[in-house]
Amino acid sequence: MHLITQKALKDAAEKYPQHKTELVALGNTIAKGYFKKPESLKAVFPSLDNFKYLDKHYVFNVGGNELRVVAMVFFESQKCYIREVMTHKEYDFFTAVHRTKGKK
């Protein structure tokens, strides 16, 4: 799968150095993998969840559930864009904002 950019992961690795290994591993695994559908990605990342308020957005738990990585995943074209890496508290706010906007 083509990882469009690793900027969000690199920035997060600097901001949360205690989780750098997990963030790098996430990026490498996505970039080296072929994931035909969400179930195949979930087989590798059991914590993967669909972000129900935005189409094609998925959430990875990283660092023992301390960080959330929100990514747009296009299975048909095998592309992944890491949108944001955030703490659990920031993710709760992100969810609340998008819940009020409705699904897009």
Curated annotation (Swiss-Prot):
Enzyme class, broadest EC rank: hydrolase
Keyword check for Hydrolase: yes
Keywords annotated in UniProt: Endonuclease, Hydrolase, Nuclease, RNA-binding, Stress response, Toxin-antitoxin system
Induction remark: Induced by amino acid starvation and when translation is blocked. Induction is decreased in the absence of the Lon protease suggesting, by homology to other toxin-antitoxin systems, that Lon may degrade the HigA antitoxin. Transcription is negatively regulated by the cognate locus, probably by HigA. A member of the higB-higA operon.
GO biological process: negative regulation of translation; regulation of DNA-templated transcription; regulation of growth; regulation of mRNA stability
EC numbers, comma separated: 3.1.-.-
GO MF: RNA binding; RNA endonuclease activity
Pfam families: HigB_toxin
GO cellular component terms listed in the entry, alphabetical order: toxin-antitoxin complex
Signal sequence extent: none
Superkingdom as given in the UniProt entry: Bacteria
UniProt similarity note: Belongs to the HigB mRNA interferase family.
Function noted in UniProt: Toxic component of a type II toxin-antitoxin (TA) system. A probable translation-dependent mRNA interferase. Overexpression causes cessation of cell growth and inhibits cell proliferation via inhibition of translation; this blockage is overcome by subsequent expression of antitoxin HigA. Overexpression causes cleavage of a number of mRNAs in a translation-dependent fashion, suggesting this is an mRNA interferase.
Assembly and binders: Probably forms a complex with the antitoxin HigA which inhibits the mRNA interferase activity.
Protein name: mRNA interferase toxin HigB
Native source species: Escherichia coli (strain K12)
